[in-house]
Amino acid sequence: MSLSDSPSKSGNTGKDLISNNEAKNHEDEETHQKKRRRRTTDAEATLLEQYFLKTPKPSLIERQELSKKLKSSMTPRELQIWFQNKRQSLRRSNCLSRNRLEGTGENSLLRRKSTLTLCETSTGQAELFFQSWPLHSQSVVGEMIHHEQDDYNKENKQQKVVDTTKDISRGSNGNEDSAAHQELEECARSLVELQQQCNDH
């Protein structure tokens, strides 16, 4: 005689045990299903916002008290998730605000267009002009320099202009910025020397 053929001591057969297990599994599935999401009311949101300003990371006891104030509309676990989401949202908005103020992303560099102009004055001395603009205004800068040079050429026919343009990466590190300026100064010195050599010949 096999086990499946013999009745159990409780009087259940094998078929009864299977149906009991199925019923138990069905109950477990219902309890493990996710709760439907519900939106907080305006009153709840106001209370939670005020509480968040005082205590952005409440303890379990504080969340339980807050749950009682909300008349159990939110469990302490739901409150914990709400506060986590609120802190993350605040961090994200602070990061976006900071990036907007800097004008660039966190890891990108601010690109600038620098123009070095060497002009000979009416007395024969060389003058050096240095200007720097953001890259997005390059075309405006080029037109402005062109118009300024045309106006200056009309007034002083003997003007000789040498334009040197260079892209400079300027990051948050001051060493990069000073190195770029040193490089431009060296370039300017060599341009002045070149201009003086041309005048001597």
Curated annotation (Swiss-Prot):
Entries under SUPFAM superfamilies matching the protein: Homeodomain-like
Start-end of DNA-binding region: 33-92
Biased composition (Basic and acidic residues): 23-32
InterPro entries (alphabetical): HD (IPR001356), Homeobox_DNA-bind_prot (IPR051000), Homeodomain-like_sf (IPR009057)
Post-translational modification: Phosphorylated in response to hydroxyurea. Phosphorylation inhibits the repressor activity and is dependent on rad3. However, the regulation of yox1 by rad3 is probably indirect.
CDD domains: homeodomain (cd00086)
A GO biological process held by the record: negative regulation of transcription by RNA polymerase II
Transmembrane segments annotated in the record for this chain: none
Cellular location(s): Nucleus
Gene3D superfamilies, per the entry: Homeodomain-like
Annotated protein name in UniProt: MBF complex negative regulatory component yox1
Organism from which the protein derives: Schizosaccharomyces pombe (strain 972 / ATCC 24843) (Fission yeast)
Gene designation per UniProt: yox1
